[in-house]
Amino acid sequence: YLENTMATHAFPAHRQAVLSLLSSQAAISLQNARLYERVQHMAESFSRFVPREFLRTLGRSQFLDIRLGENIQKEMTVMFADIRNFTTLVERMDPKHNVDFLNSYLSYMEPEILAAGGFVDSYLGDGIMALFDSAPASGGTTALACGATAALGMLRALRAFNANHSARAGLQLQIGVGLNRGLVTLGTIGGADRLKCGVIGDTVNVASRLEGLTKRYGVPVLLTGSTQRALTPELRSRTRFLDRVRVAGHVEPIEVFELFDAETKARALDAWNEALELYYARHFAEAGRAFHALDNSFDGDVALRSFEARARKLARQPPAEDWCGIETMLEK
């Protein structure tokens, strides 16, 4: 009918009414489709700022459902990761190069966290805060080792990043990673006009302190004793006891372990532990000699030099009877 200009009465009144109704419904459908597409786009955009895993933990499926003050307590592994001396490293770069360089680095780190079952809670400048659920994973396997698995993956990714990017920029990045497992509070924090989904608690604070201690001990990854004991036997064989410390802002002392991927350290672990036993048994002179004998296995190791120096000093100046070998850290 429409193509035949000679045709008349192609659309009588009843057909015009039907056509008008169908047109209105089609217009509404198109409008709803565009609205749905926009909502989906907004949801995808928001998910880049607030992880979907965070929403699921709070029992919410949409960002619009979040309300101020919602919170839940949950056992998780908290990770803090930071580039060592980043400010000094990027002084030679212009601002745009700084941002591009940092985004490139983060693009290497984030996949390792996601692959291990974690999610990035926030980016803190050149730092990363990530969370790993400590609940049993599917198939009955433990999820407690996910943070450690991610940390080792990040070390491998860092080597690839340095080979592909840092060499061209004249930089070789090093990172520090702190891991701690325990109870945390996840919730919405802020005021009436500004909300932030975040995680708080002593577990978070200790993980942050451990990341800072990686500089003191000269190792890339540190974890607490409770975190170390929750690892699989294979991963525990990749840990080394380093110290008993009382970190700033924390009353109770914690055990500090290194997580490593070097075969030379793995082969020398028994000798390291024997030297530690001598040290904590107050046989300081013998401990000093035992630590010194490990120089070849732990070449340039900061913790080894520290324990050797401490053992020799205590051999000359024996401590009080209540000495228990706890180091107190005054700085964060």
Where are these regions (language model features)?
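Intrinsically disordered, low-complexity, charge-biased linker/tail regions
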Residues: 320-332
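Cytosolic regulatory/linker segments at or just downstream of nucleotide-handling modules
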Residues: 184, 214-286, 292-293, 298-323
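Alpha-helical scaffold within the catalytic cores of cyclic-nucleotide enzymes
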Residues: 103-118, 134-177, 202-215, 236-237
